[in-house]
Amino acid sequence: MTDSVGGAFFGRQIPFLELIGARAEHWEKGRAVVSVDVRPELTNSWKFAHGGVVLTLLDVAMGAAARTTDAKGHGIVTVNITVNFLRSSSGLLRAEGRVLRGGRSLVFCEGDVKDVSGETMAIGIGTFRLKKRDGDAK
């Protein structure tokens, strides 16, 4: 299953992801892959991917993986993310999020970001809360 992250990932518009050009490549129960082509406006002063872009990819990939565990279609909000930046990179970046454990309201995930050569540039862990949206059916 694939879709545009900003366009309709899980049927939701996410304007910030449209702005940076993030794309959903794949999602299945407990796993999601998201990518972005690092344009000049997404780089730091050394012309590598800005750390905020890398963190965003991890947040989206892990959050999307967490969301795949919920049969009720709740939204996801980030409770906590810890990221370790291992190396700098640019070009196409791909983040994979994986569920470690899920419960009724919290989902624990891990993820990594790799560059086009397959080198890992960042790893992270995150906690996500399943949250009913106002107006959604129970």
Labelled PLM ranges:
Residues 1-138:
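Terminal targeting signals and extreme-terminal segments of soluble enzymes
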